[in-house]
């Protein structure tokens, strides 16, 4: 799939490819614009956003009505905690699972979103 492709998998199951890329100068070589995807999976009435390796890109403004978001937090390849906070504030998911965070202090994301009443941050050790 390429950016903006939509695949109807079943009557109640759809997969949308959304852009995923780096914007930080010097890091854009890791994930150049136009090459990689994140995905929105719709299962019945539930929308799940899996961002892929990306930063807080302008296209996030088109990511709407998300129930569960998976955002990567691990510079130099993905978002900083501050970028993940901004991305969450744009997307406004009901539930956020930060992932791909390695040695990043992921509690910065939870702390930065503590006043966001519409999003529950769930930190899990994802293998």
Which residues make up each language-model segment?
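Core dinuclear metal-dependent hydrolase active-site scaffold
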Residues: 1-64, 124-127
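Binuclear metal-ion centers of metallo-dependent hydrolases, dominated by the metallo-beta-lactamase
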Residues: 1-9, 85, 89-127
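Active-site environment of divalent metal-dependent phosphoester hydrolases
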Residues: 5-8, 24-25, 55-59, 76-81, ...
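Broad hydrophobic/π-residue packing in well-ordered secondary structure
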Residues: 39-41, 48-50, 77, 101-104, ...
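Proline-aspartate-enriched helix->loop->beta-strand connector
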Residues: 66-71, 75-98
């Amino acid at each position: 799939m390429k950016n903006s492709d939509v695949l109807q998998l079943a009557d109640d199951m759809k997969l949308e490819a959304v852009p995923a890329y780096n914007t930080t100068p010097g890091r854009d070589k890791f994930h150049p614009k136009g090459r990689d995807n994140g995905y929105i999976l719709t299962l019945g009435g539930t929308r799940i956003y899996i961002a892929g390796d990306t930063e807080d890109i302008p296209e996030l403004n088109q990511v709407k009505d998300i129930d569960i978001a998976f955002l990567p937090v691990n510079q130099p390849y993905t978002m900083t905690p501050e970028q993940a906070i901004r991305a969450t504030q744009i997307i406004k998911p009901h539930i956020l699972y930060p992932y791909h965070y390695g040695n990043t202090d992921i509690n910065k994301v939870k702390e930065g979103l503590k006043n966001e009443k519409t999003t529950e941050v769930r930190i899990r050790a994802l293998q």
